Amino acid sequence: HINRRPWWDTGKQSSKGDDASAGGGKCGEYNDCKKDDRGGSGGGGESQNKKIIDSLKGYKCAQDILKQMPNLNNDLARLLKDTFDTNDKVNITFKAKEGMGSVDGIKSFTEYKNGVFNTTIDLNADVLKYATQEYILVTMYHEFIHAYLSYQVSTLPYDQYTAKFPKVSEYEVKDSNGNIIKKYALIKDHKNYGSFIESLKNSIISFNPVITSSYAEALAKNGIIKRITENKSKINKNERDTRNNEYKGKKCP
């Protein structure tokens, strides 16, 4: 089973002040405040003025995609640019990580200290090696939204945060180590339910207009819809690993 974390899952608990809160002293249930291991990107609080940080050395295709992400013609690109690419006090690092199994990406570090927000996204090295460019792109955008939500919960009063973002239902899964992780699914009748999928779908089409709307939607739904159809699951499986030669997107050179 492919696991791209539901993007509204910020790692915060249900009580005020969790997940790198403005007070800077608490961690969410994902232990987001753990020691920063970004390597060449520097330690926590040392990445000021770097904004969107490329720590993907050895994965040129992913590096090229990351360069394009803030400049594509879609809503998420504009949000990424406005949040991280124009503010030297809000920084995001993308880095590759081995041994992530079925997890495509995860927000592994978050810190809000002295008015500076730093966050790190770990991306599955196997996905960066074998997935189509479209799959890598939507995974990066998906995880960016996790980071964006963490930024919002770090800087907004909790009641404003909960009013701004959709209500969700909670469920539990086990990670590759057998640890219980809480995740969240959108309430189906929520009026904004479709807009999140639409934004991710449009980001794929803006990157590759040849991809059909229904195909892009299948990629966008992965990790947003708790249970997707068998056909959509197969599409994601094929795009995640080009070695099966059943993909429709662009293979990395």
Show where each model-derived region lies.
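Extracellular C-terminal loop/segment signatures of secreted glycoproteins
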Residues: 156-159
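Soluble non-cytosolic domains of exported or imported proteins
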Residues: 71, 130-135, 139
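Active-site scaffold of zinc-dependent metalloenzymes
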Residues: 103-134, 150
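Active-site or metal-binding loop neighborhoods of secreted/extracellular toxin and effector enzymes
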Residues: 2-27, 161-253
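Low-complexity, glycine/serine/proline-rich disordered segments
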Residues: 1-116, 228-253
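Active-site recognition of the HExxH zinc-binding catalytic motif
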Residues: 138-151
